[in-house]
Structure formats: structure tokens, C-alpha cells
Design a protein with these regions (language model features):
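Hydrophobic alpha-helical segments and helix pairs
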Residues: 60-100
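N-terminal low-complexity, intrinsically disordered segments
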Residues: 1-67, 202, 208, 238-241
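Aromatic/basic-lined ligand-recognition segments
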Residues: 51-57, 107-184
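Conserved short hydrophobic interaction patches
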Residues: 25, 88, 92-99, 216-219, ...
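Long, compositionally biased interface segments
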Residues: 189-241
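Short amphipathic alpha-helical segments
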Residues: 14, 18, 81-88, 92, ...
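Short glycine-rich, low-complexity/disordered patches
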Residues: 29-43, 98-113, 144-152, 223-241
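Glycine-rich, often proline-containing surface loops adjacent to acidic residues and nearby aromatics
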Residues: 1, 63-79, 105-113, 188-201
């Protein structure tokens, strides 16, 4: 997600020119009116208004571009390689810059939400401390800890990273709900969530956005690899880039 100073034109009218530029890859369109979170003023929560979130979705529904008056984002359910994601993002940012000429980006970032499933990896009988490094497990990482006794065990970390980047990490065991597209029945599965939000703040010129994202991405790989054990790494059958 990349943030920029509010562009009122985006809120005031449908993004026709931007859609024309990316419609070949993202033919589906939806507009959502979202309620902004309340802000605290004078010790009281003050209700805020709404914001238009324009969404452009690929034909297979695996990729989505979100555009509001203050940010643009690309998300996917099927992330496999950085190179593909980066190429798509580069085309989207080029179309956005041409349509709206933003002054600069105030925040550029990448967010990776990982859900590790033991059964899917053939690790049903493994304990999380065999798969996740101790620093990401908290008390559950102790050798004598009973994994099933923990009702909640969430770690929240904010740290400075090389190259001027920062990260927010949220991790811990949880339940992931899966919905069968045919029957619409839902099923919950135990997973370990690793939510990594990497970003750079400050005024980033348009022509420096891609280099800034490369710095952010460069930190993502080391963070991810540092969070998992060799056992989990090998079970995921990583491919060479």
C-alpha cells in the first residue's frame, strides 16, 4: 500500500481514466463506501465521514487494485514470485501517476500475511516450536509449554530495518475460516499467522517509489526466513528464484 496526500478528484468522481489504463488486466469493478474510524478529540471519540474505495479486480479474482483519495494498493491471494508482483505494481503506479500526478508518496509499503497450516505441509504431529523460531512464539516457545493450553498468544513487534525501512509484525496461533465455494459451508483450521507489514515513511518522490519498494522487499525475505525453522522451510519446498 502506498499513501499520498489527499487527492480530492479521486473522491469527487469515478476514476474513468485510471480504469481505462488498467482494465485489460483488471476488468471487474466495484465501488465500496467505507466508514472511516472515529478520531479522539478533547477526550471524546468524534465520528468521521465515509470514503470511496474503488476496486479493480482481475478476471480470475486473484488480484485486486484498491484506490481511495489517500492510498493505492495491490493485493493478491496467489502470490508466488516477487518479480510478477513488482511488474504488476509498476504498471499500476505508472497509470496512477499519469492519471492523478500525486506530489509524492508519504508511505510506501508491502504487507505479507502468511498462514502456516500443519496438515497442508504434512506436519500434523509437529509442535509449533519445532516450526517457528522461539522469538515469535513468546511463552509458547518454552520447552515445557503445553501448546494446547494457550487460548491466545499474540506477539506484536515494531522495529527499524536496514535501508531506513520499518516493520510491524503480528504473529501467533489462531483459527482460519475456509469457505467451500460450492456448498458455502465454512470450516475452521488451526494455523500460525505471521503478519509482516514493511514500509518506508517520509516524502518519497514518484521516481523513487520503486527503489523504495525494493528496499522494503529486500527486508521481507530475511524477516520471513528468520521466523521459521529449517523443518518448516524444507516442508514448504522452496523454489530457487
Amino acid at each position: 500500500r502506498s499513501r499520498f496526500p489527499d487527492i480530492l478528484k479521486i473522491e469527487a468522481q469515478e476514476p474513468y481514466a485510471f480504469q481505462d489504463a488498467i482494465r485489460g488486466e483488471y476488468p471487474q469493478y466495484a465501488k465500496k463506501v467505507e466508514q472511516l474510524p472515529p478520531q479522539q478529540a478533547g477526550g471524546k471519540l468524534t465520528p468521521q465521514g465515509t470514503v470511496n474505495n474503488y476496486q479493480f479486480i482481475s478476471a480470475d479474482s486473484q488480484w485486486k487494485v484498491s484506490l481511495t483519495k489517500s492510498f493505492i494498493a495491490l493485493s493478491t491471494h496467489g502470490y508466488t514470485r516477487w518479480e510478477e508482483f513488482a511488474k504488476r505494481l509498476d504498471r499500476i503506479l505508472a497509470a496512477f501517476i499519469q492519471a492523478y500526478q500525486p506530489a509524492y508518496f508519504s508511505r510506501v509499503g508491502l504487507r505479507y500475511i502468511n498462514a502456516f497450516r500443519k496438515a497442508e505441509l504434512g506436519l500434523e504431529n509437529a509442535q509449533w516450536r519445532e516450526l517457528i523460531q522461539p522469538g515469535y512464539l513468546g511463552l509458547m516457545g518454552d520447552d515445557d509449554a503445553q501448546e494446547g493450553a494457550f487460548l491466545k498468544n499474540e506477539q506484536n513487534i515494531t522495529a527499524a530495518m536496514p535501508g531506513g525501512a520499518k516493520c510491524n509484525i503480528k504473529c501467533g496461533p489462531g483459527m482460519l475460516r475456509k469457505i467451500n465455494n460450492q456448498t458455502r459451508q465454512s470450516q475452521e483450521e488451526k494455523v500460525f499467522m505471521l503478519d509482516i507489514d514493511l514500509f518506508m515513511e517520509g516524502n518519497t518522490p514518484m521516481n523513487h517509489a520503486v527503489p523504495a519498494l525494493n528496499v522494503v522487499h529486500g527486508n521481507a525475505g530475511s524477516l520471513f526466513r528468520g521466523a521459521i525453522t529449517d523443518t518448516l522451510h524444507d516442508a514448504m519446498e522452496p523454489r530457487d528464484a
